[in-house]
Amino acid sequence: MSTVAVWETSRPATTAQQVLESLRHRLVSGMLRPGQRVTQEDVAVSLGVSVAPVREALRVLEQEGQLVYRPRRGYFVTELRIEDLEEIYELRRVLEERLARLALPELDDETLTRVRSAAEECELAGESADVALELAANRRFHFGLLECADQPHTMRMIRLLWDSTEPYRAIYYNSPAERRRAAKAHKRILAAVAARDAERLVAELDAHRDRALAVLRDILEPA
């Protein structure tokens, strides 16, 4: 029997989907670091599965930009230059501002409750230093807000941009001080949402994003 955890979904996950979820967890938890080689054989042995579903999962992560394939060498966790991060974060700024403005009038009480819950889960995970859980809650928080805009094509692009920097986000959240700072930023974002203040919301999202980029810039280009 496979040692991969089974997803709690209405339809049974395929082995490839289970492998993909496991690899995503390794990326966001920092078990797989930028530049690290990922071999099909090692992954297959560690999860107790055959190579075929591992190969399929690795291809998905390559398409998302989280892995790169080098001929005759295999797969590696993507390494980004600071210029790459700056481009990605600028694209996020433009797309997320658009969705934030569209989403704000559509946010109902039920959605706001879910978003607040995600922020609380993010903070609690940060306090216990569970980076993988914190990153998952962080996504639910941000995407829960933006998805209210009902712009699926823009949302798909935003998800791809987030995916491409996930290993670096894990590095950012490894800092206790930055985890606390992020929790405070989420509270300010929620306050702007509660006030239905679009300009304030955009400003808080920009500040939150800019802080993450500044930390990553320092990591990639130390003084």
List where the protein language model places each region.
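C-terminal all-alpha effector/ligand-binding and dimerization domain
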Residues: 11, 116-123, 163, 170-223
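Short linear motifs at protein or domain termini
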Residues: 1-105, 110, 213-223
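Amphipathic alpha-helical dimerization/coiled-coil segments
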Residues: 95-124, 128-131
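Hydrophobic, amphipathic alpha-helical faces that serve as interaction scaffolds
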Residues: 91-107, 139-176, 212-216
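Positions in alpha-helical segments
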Residues: 75, 83-86, 101, 120, ...
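Hydrophobic packing residues in well-ordered alpha-helices of helical domains and bundles
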Residues: 88, 115, 134, 138, ...
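Short loop-to-helix capping motifs
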Residues: 129-130, 151-152, 196-197
